[in-house]
A protein has these predicted regions:
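Residue-level detector of conserved catalytic or cofactor/ligand-binding positions
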Residues: 192-200
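Glycine-rich, mobile lid/loop segments that gate access to catalytic sites or pores
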Residues: 140, 148, 159
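M16 family metallopeptidases and their MPP-like homologs
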Residues: 15-17, 23-43, 60-116, 152-175, ...
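Active-site SXXK
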Residues: 44-50
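Short, polar/flexible loop-turn hinges at active-site or ligand-entry regions and domain interfaces
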Residues: 53-56, 98-101, 120-129
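N- or domain-start disorder-to-order transition segments that initiate the globular core
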Residues: 1-24
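Acidic/histidine-enriched alpha-helical segments
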Residues: 64, 120-144
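Active-site glycine-rich loop that binds ribose-phosphate moieties when present
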Residues: 182-189
């Protein structure tokens, strides 16, 4: 199979980078958006909430069991900053199909599970579960506060905030504590709808 990049929907790209020297398959699903002070905390919180459960696997225990059936597949969340863009999403990995017992296919069900997290997250009353949003919001705020404890990261962030105060580049990849504190399950769900409609 050759390396390729193809637009599968408007603003949605599939990039394939085959590498036979590895014994694992890796799948990355990323949302790339302009870094924006008002939306950065929402974007940073979104993958953490989506990774808490799907309608089929509504909690971490059920998700963990589903991953265990795929030989210990792992799915982690990512929140990165690349210039004036914010990249958030998931990275999943599993044993490459070539090494699975009995030739079992693992990549497709792993991709389906990531697809469920993105497209069929657990909801109640048309919104994300309040419990999940509040729990992950606390984690996000803790991560924002923890930057102060690392002198190098804190100095770098403050430098960018001062030098690039009026530019997207000055915004932290995690957003700010004040905005994060105001997020609710309703506002996060509405943000996700706007976020995905921008891509369409």
């Amino acid at each position: 199979m050759m390396e390729f990049r193809r637009e599968i929907m408007r603003h949605v790209y599939l990039t394939v980078l085959p590498a036979s020297k590895f014994k694992t398959s890796c799948l990355s699903a990323q949302f790339v958006t302009e870094l924006d002070r008002e939306r950065a905390a929402y974007n940073a919180l979104l993958p953490a909430v989506l990774s808490r459960g799907t309608m089929r696997c509504p909690d971490m225990e059920a998700l963990s069991a589903a991953m265990d059936t795929l030989y210990g597949t792992t799915v982690t969340t990512t929140v990165r900053k690349n210039g004036e863009r914010q990249c958030v999403g998931f990275v999943a990995s599993c044993i490459d199909d070539r090494f699975a017992l009995g030739g079992e296919k693992l990549l497709e069900p792993m991709a389906a599970l990531v697809g469920e997290m993105l497209l069929d997250p657990v909801t109640q009353g048309g919104h994300y579960l309040r419990e999940y949003v509040e729990s992950e919001k606390v984690n996000l705020i803790d991560s924002i506060r923890a930057i102060r404890n690392d002198k190098r990261d804190w100095a770098n962030l403050r430098l960018l905030q001062e030098m690039c105060a009026a530019e997207p580049y000055g915004v932290s990849r995690l957003g700010d504590e004040e905005t994060a504190g105001k997020i609710t399950n309703h506002t996060l769900f509405r943000h996700c709808l706007l976020y995905t409609s921008d891509a369409a």
